[in-house]
Amino acid sequence: MAQVAVSTLPVEDEESSESRMVVTFLMSALESMCKELAKSKAEVACIAVYETDVFVVGTERGRAFVNTRKDFQKDFVKYCVEEEEKAAEMHKMKSTAQANRMSVDAVEIETLRKTVEDYFCFCYGKALGKSTVVPVPYEKMLRDQSAVVVQGLPEGVAFKHPENYDLATLKWILENKAGISFIIKRPFLEPKKHLGGRVMVTDAERSMISPSGSCGPVKVKTEPSEDSGISLEMAAVTVKEESEDPDYYQYNIQAGPSETDDVDDKLPLSKSLQGSHHSSEGNEGTEMEVPAEDDDYPPPAKRPKSSEPPQPPVTEPANAGKRKVREFNFEKWNARITDLRKQVEELFERKYAQAIKAKGPVTIPYPLFQSHVEDLYVEGLPEGIPFRRPSTYGIPRLERILLAKERIRFVIKKHELLNSTREDLQLDKPASGVKEEWYARITKLRKMVDQLFCKKFAEALGSTEAKAVPYQKFEAHPNDLYVEGLPENIPFRSPSWYGIPRLEKIIQVGNRIKFVIKRPELLTHSTTEVTQPRTNTPVKEDWNVRITKLRKQVEEIFNLKFAQALGLTEAVKVPYPVFESNPEFLYVEGLPEGIPFRSPTWFGIPRLERIVRGSNKIKFVVKKPELVISYLPPGMASKINTKALQSPKRPRSPGSNSKVPEIEVTVEGPNNSNPQTSAVRTPTQTNGSNVPFKPRGREFSFEAWNAKITDLKQKVENLFNEKCGEALGLKQAVKVPFALFESFPEDFYVEGLPEGVPFRRPSTFGIPRLEKILRNKAKIKFIIKKPEMFETAIKESTSSSKSPPRKINSSPSVNTTASGVEDLNIIQVTIPDDDNERLSKVEKARQLREQVNDLFSRKFGEAIGMGFPVKVPYRKITINPGCVVVDGMPPGVSFKAPSYLEISSMRRILDSAEFIKFTVIRPFPGLVINNQLVDQNESEGPVIQESAEPTQLEVPATEEIKETDGNSQIKQEPDPTW
């Protein structure tokens, strides 16, 4: 095909126009042939020269390659011109020996220049992380010499285009080429604005490259503008700019043509041809990860925005749509950053091993390098990058470190530092990961600081034995109880508040620390006396005291109103589970709008206050007193006469529009004469306060619910027994010894349970979890590592079950009943004496959960600046990852609501209670920090009163459903993802 183009050169001037038409026609035919070859997966590149016109045809990749190599085109044009001149001269005169010798020298120097240029292209491509040659932007490098540095050139030889070197210099460079290398400090992105020589683009090429951009990214690069006089240099420069775009993607997982195609999508030709400097700068900021912007962990919402150029859309709808569709791929990003961190980690370990002359795997003591920067440091890191763990770097810094890996060197001036601490590091830092290493270190430092504080506190009291420091009292009375000698800008707090840097600073100045106690009597006051002075602080009143007082007040209101409904003069405790189980016969009217009837323990401060303000309107309606008689004290139950229950007009729904007739409740007086009659009227609901509660109550059937949950519990128990038998290699089911699984979780555990569902007795689960377990039964598997212990437990349980049963008295006083409970999700159950052991375990688990919940509440209150326990919004913390970070959790135990934690995990949490710390990284809506509400759009969010007490704090209402232990659930369990 090249011969066809060359054969068109020797033509006469009068035949120029006709020959041009012939050439155009033949080039179109050649283009068609290239398309057919492309269908057979053959790649073709063709350069044709006719007079001053240059034609580039071929397949897509062939054209792209030729257009990126300006030197190929120049060399071919130059070769054709020289050949034509040589042919003319050969016919006119004979070349002399000197001329022949000069010709040989010219060929030799041209060959050497070509060799040097190819080697420069290879080195430049290697610096970009590519295995192919990449054209060197000589003009840009000479204009901006700090962007790319060339090392290894012979002494006295400056870097420039090989055309400017003489024969001796070229030979010298080739002799020393092994030491030549390119170091890219800043990639080139801005396209050139100057046009070079004139190159004519014909209609054949226009038809070959569609302006619509539908032929793919490579075609867009060679698309001409409306001016047919676009130069050869401009076309080549445009392609070279695009080839340099992926400078920071050389470590990407994907490679090959798809990588360049993605980059080509980012730089449409219309911007480069128009010479738009600003648009190119916009692309530079959006398409590259600039090292200065080293966000270690870019959020997913940030990256997709950067993939869309900020300039107005160009006239290429196909490409524009393509760019908008591109979204952040977290999996690809995660795989990429993980791979880069692994490479940098291996690089650091290899360099560190070389520095200490060790063989085999080594562990770098990063804390030592940070605490002894003069004696232990690293040289050769890129400018602006400190030496840290690779897990703290982002992608740009990781790539820059890998580019400079040959220069990196560990400098160890004092080897004794490594030897003296190596044993401590191995003892205190588990090798299972960064998190365990950090946990061990901060735990040790906090314990040291706590011991230091206890010792100094005891010295201030005149004692020689260490005493526990009452940190809350120091915070409550900063003028009378304070600490001197702490490092600058470090307040006195519990050690659990401090991070590693502050803990180390406190230990360094431990000798200067002094506790000042001006009023020792404050340390002996009771809790109520201590909290009294705090009522004048901005918090105004302790939240825990306040909500407890309100709940007690609402409880008294409910008890009094319930007694009035029964015609009694004394307050009677309300059996809340019975009211929920029988909403048609037992309900409450007059509650504030939107507040259902529940135990006061379910309500937060805002709803409790609304109930207290509207207490005069509250009225209990009891249509079937016999339902509640068994829950009344014996003396009270005998005073209620239930004869009025036989009225035929009674069973009307409270929601009907007709009036509900009165029922008479006869109450015997003290002298058992003159009975009193109190009329209880149930008018139609008008304020809609119980609207959200009544429909749910009418739909709820306790009998159906009880039958369903009993059946599900039996199925799950049978499933567990079958899986337990399979684990022992038996065909029959084996009763599961749950106590053994709870006592030895390392040797006996269950795999395959649904996420968020712990292994417990089926009787402790609600309907949602039971159904999830049954749906997941194929994956459930029992792991029994000690069969002999298991068999012993089975035999003991079998022998105990065969013992003669004790005589059970039918009297209700013999059985242990769960009376006095208030929560809606607890029903009254009767537990035989034989199950006392199981009850004690359930009670123990419940106590552990309460202790862990109290611990989390106290720590969360400290984190938001309250200084008192605040209910932890577990669900909001779960659905807003990264907003609240919990430090100090034991290794292997993740932060969850206590109802989702195993007994062993809760015990470990309580053991590490002093080290657990909540940190609010990014507040979520509804969170109160230092009396400031983050977002008041929450329906039950915190309320700040402005009328009576402008500084009194409202804490979000605790309306969330809690799971309870034992056989004590009446309502459907909440979503276990909470």
Curated annotation (Swiss-Prot):
Residues 669-690 have a biased composition (Polar residues). Belongs to the TFII-I family. The lineage of its organism: Eukaryota, Metazoa, Chordata, Craniata, Vertebrata. This is General transcription factor II-I. It is found in: Cytoplasm; Nucleus. One of its GO terms (cellular component) is nucleus. The modification Phosphoserine is found at S19, S103, S207, S210, S214, S391, S496, S647, S653, S701, S763, S803. GO terms for molecular function: DNA binding; DNA-binding transcription factor activity. Residues 208-323, 641-660, 666-693, 795-816, 939-978 are annotated as: Disordered. It comes from Bos taurus. The modification Phosphothreonine is found at T535, T537.
